[in-house]
Amino acid sequence: MEEKKVVRALSEHLSLPPPPSPSVAVAINGKKKSKYVVFWALEKFIPEGFTDFKLLYVRPPVSYIPTPMGIAVAVSELREDVVSAYKQELDWSANEMLRPYKKMFERRKVQVEVLLLDSLEPAAAIAEEIAGTGVTKLVIGMSLRGFFSRKIDMSSLIATAVPRFCTVYVISKGKLASVRPSESDASGSIRFERSSSTSGSTDSPRLPPEYQDFLSAVSEAQSRVSPFSPALKHSMGSNAVAQMDTSSSGTDQEEVSTGRGMEIVHSGIEGKKNKDESFSASFPMGTEAYNSMSWTSKWRDHEDRREMRSSSSSNNHDLVNMDWGAVVPENYSWVSHTASHMSDGLLSVHSITDNQVNLNFEIEKLRAELKHVQEMYAMAQTETVGASKKLTELNQRRFEESEKLVELKEKEEVAKDTASKEKQRYEEAMKEAEKVKELMMKEALHRREAEFKAERDAREKDKLQASLVSPGVQYQHYTWEEIAAATSDFAENLKIGIGAYGSVYKCNLHHTTGAVKVLHAGETQLSKQFDQELEILSKIRHPHLVLLLGACPERGCLVYEYMDNGSLDDRLMLVNDTPPIPWFERFRIALEVASALVFLHKSKPRPIIHRDLKPGNILLDHNFVSKLGDVGLSTMVNQDDVSSRTIFKQTSPVGTLCYIDPEYQRTGIISPKSDVYSLGVVILQLITAKPAIAITHMVEEAIGDDAEFMAILDKKAGSWPISDTRELAALGLCCTEMRRRDRPDLKDQIIPALERLRKVADKAQNLLSRTPSGPPSHFICPLLKGVMNEPCVAADGYTYDREAIEEWLRQKDTSPVTNLPLPNKNLIANYTLYSAIMEWKSNKR
């Protein structure tokens, strides 16, 4: 009764409804049968368009915490971190328990919010949550108990406590057991109906018309009896059907029928007497004495009074009544007391009339017929209950089997997906293994080819060493004393350059200005480079290769012709405030460098690869004629390897960073196209005058836009022709491709393109020349006083026409210029000057 008062007070407190919520609340207790409640809610409300659910779970608040010794300690006596950890453990356990229910919502692809409510009063907590959120649909499970149970009917308490704007659905074993409609659905009426699958009974069968008056009389008698409490309704066992309707006046009425020999008979005689007097007439001992009787005594007394009423036809007061206390055991005094009050109401009968005997006879007849109908109804009900139980079990089994089938299908899909991934991984592994196998075979083949080439190179090296000491090497031999005197004992003011392999000094040997390179002493590698450079420069001649005047092999000194304008790198970077090189001269320099590379690559008997081409190794004479120098890092390859194959070098890559072929850096394999890569970088520096670092990327980004492209060009070189300069830049980018096979051929593609650009530069240069100029002074022979036809260098260091100097030497042993004795009469052809003279003559024509 106390709980009922609390529920009623809470219901009145929560009577004002909040804004309605589109959610459906499902309250569970976490037991096995809770899944039927969730399943019913999903099947019911998802087709109606509800996609937002709230899962309510009420648990008692934490007031004590158990210890490992089994002692419960109050929360107030423990630290906050211990209490917090214990609560987190409880939250984790609750979430793990609710996980299967959340999966049921997730499989149906609907939103679910899990709410953990801490309260000692589940009905009050759920009602407060419904009132706060405005949920209009609540689904709960039925609280089942036996006839003699005193357990609280929690479903009834919840249905009573929940605000009136919410409809409550009570579920039992997956089926709807009862509904408490909201005020908007049923105008304030609340109706509980127990289905046959849960309570074992159905609604009373419809009686024939002749029994309607009888039932009306029974209802009138019951209206004077105080209604049962919800606890009494649910304690009446599986053979009771309780129906509660709330009328407009708010009065509760209950109709109860039983099939255990209990009968309700109301006489139709008009006139009423006091119920206490009626009960005293039927039981003179009094109400208190009757309530104190045992179950057996009450039943026997009930039978005696029934026989007395049947046999006494002259009695003024005949009432057939079933005593409610005879049904309930003596242990449940509160049920007996309530039943006695109902009996008191039923014993209030009307005044005795003259046709009392006939009415009693009719009542007995109706009682017999009603008993027969009830027996038939009980039999049908028993069969219905059995069938309903079987159907429920079958439905439950079908539901479990369907869940297992869904799980098996999910496992099957996961297994198929895993198998597919494993198969794909296996195929990829097999393909990778095949690739590795092919790479290993290619690597073995390359290794054998490299070993073969290494042996061949060793033989070629031996031949080269033998040829270095052969008499075929032609160069002027200088002593160490002569070189020291020519450089003023290597004075610092005469030093014009220094590198990784030696220093370069300006010298004057035999009245000839030259440049002597002195290699660092004591290094075997430098000795090899000296011998290689001496051999190459002493045997080959080209207008765009630096001319070797002589050497001192004992001290590692090489004497070159002196280049007045220094290196291309110094002129591009304007070192010492030197004037910039015009753009048309740069076009010509690119062609000259390319022609020198073609000459080296096509030399006989073996091609030569420079390997260290950069602006610092491109020297300029007083007419800006370019010549390649520093061939000490050059290497020779076999003639068969020039066009299609490369040579494998076992040493680490040599050269200057940013100019080295990327494939040569990565593999150590050198080829003529390694020089092509360096040439491409030099071309890009000619047009931009910028360092080699990232120059390829910079030109690639700007070449597509005229404004950006003009911005990266060297503006100090003059007015660049945009289309021709872009063509030269594109050629430089092609030369700097990462893969050798993507680079153009030097002779067949690069040289023709540069020759066409040189013609454009020559036309521009001729337009800038106002008056035709005469031959340069160094073209004039000191003997002939005219342009030389075949220039050559004599022992005094001056250049003469060959015919004129030979005629002079046949007659005299002195120099035509200095008039000093000549140390020898050897003549060295000056091919560089010869090429310049021929070019000047062709341009003049």
Swiss-Prot record:
GO BP annotations listed: protein ubiquitination
Database matches in CDD domains: RING-Ubox_WDSUB1-like, USP_STK_Ubox_N
Residue span of region Disordered: 180-210, 229-258
Domain U-box positions: 774-845
Function: Functions as an E3 ubiquitin ligase.
Family the UniProt entry places it in: Belongs to the protein kinase superfamily. Ser/Thr protein kinase family.
Stated name of the protein: U-box domain-containing protein 52
Taxonomic superkingdom: Eukaryota
Pfam families from the UniProt entry: Pkinase, U-box
Keyword field: ATP-binding, Coiled coil, Kinase, Nucleotide-binding, Serine/threonine-protein kinase, Transferase, Ubl conjugation pathway
